[in-house]
Amino acid sequence: MIKDILNKADEKMNKTVDVLVKELASMKAGRANPAILDKIEVEYYGAMTPISQLAGISIPEARILAIQPWDKSALKSIEKAILKSDLGINPSNDGEIIRLIIPELTEETRKNIVKNIKKTGEDSKVAIRGIRRECNDKFKALKKKNDISEDEIKKGEEQIQKKTDIFIKNIDAILEKKEKEIMSL
């Protein structure tokens, strides 16, 4: 029973870290990264569609993203969606390809990005701690039902605390790496 609870907690914690890694990948780092387009959806034949499903995205140079729609009629819609987004990048449309030139990051922009990284990381840590709390609540519920002994509960609580500590250290390492990446560009 405890093992099942711990395994589910492990899965949830891994998913939390995966979400963090994806979110951090989508944060601008002064170089071209197709992940910055992941959250942008384009109105295409009446449906909101991710850019990645409408076009090939390549990186011809370190700070340039090239978006080549499979259907040329989607060019204007893609351009409009990028302009509406919070990317802060003006697309260059030559009728075939949309180019996004990623600007150099200013010191102020870097600090804002690092602040967002820290907030995102803190949200992930809160989620991990919430998973720990859920597990401890489940252990206490089992104790009330007299399904497990006090010793087993203590052992389970220690194990979930160890997992929590490991995942939080992992998140800290991921955040530190991303912060260094942003500040060293």
Swiss-Prot record:
Protein's UniProt keywords contain Transmembrane: no
Keywords: Cytoplasm, Protein biosynthesis
GO cellular component, one term: cytoplasm
Compartment list: Cytoplasm
Any GO MF annotation of the entry: ribosomal large subunit binding
An example Gene Ontology biological process: translational termination
UniProt keyword Nucleotide-binding present: no
Principal location class: cytoplasm
NCBIfam families, sorted: frr
PANTHER family xrefs: MITOCHONDRIAL RIBOSOME RECYCLING FACTOR PSEUDO 1, RIBOSOME RECYCLING FACTOR
Function description: Responsible for the release of ribosomes from messenger RNA at the termination of protein biosynthesis. May increase the efficiency of translation by recycling ribosomes from one round of translation to another.
Stated family: Belongs to the RRF family.
This protein's name: Ribosome-recycling factor
Organism: Clostridium kluyveri (strain ATCC 8527 / DSM 555 / NBRC 12016 / NCIMB 10680 / K1)
